[in-house]
């Protein structure tokens, strides 16, 4: 299956790693947010996904705005994709991108949708004292985590569970 992965944050690395190991997936490249300055000295750092893509010898595009980057859009179009997999990318995809792959775009989201759409679902689950959280796989549409849910997998949240611990568990679960 001809596939491109969209992601930026560390939490998405296990999903990219898993896709790269699946024999039925022909992983053709990665799209990530641009590198950003970090630390006191504001040294430009690659995103965790870009760093992993380099270790996996995958090309990585980093458009500031995926909706307006003709080079990245042309590259994606030329790949004749079956699917785009997205996790923690940080930009909404335009309908032109959503319609490129034959089987559409799927998003891995760290909440039990429809609860906690958008940013910070892990923190909201902890803040609200939820008894469980999980990961949802959804078919993407133009909204923020609003497409049809394909599958979910839940895990309990214990009284001692921190946001950092839940983050790590959900990243692996994805």
Where are these regions (language model features)?
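One-carbon transfer enzymes
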Residues: 1-174
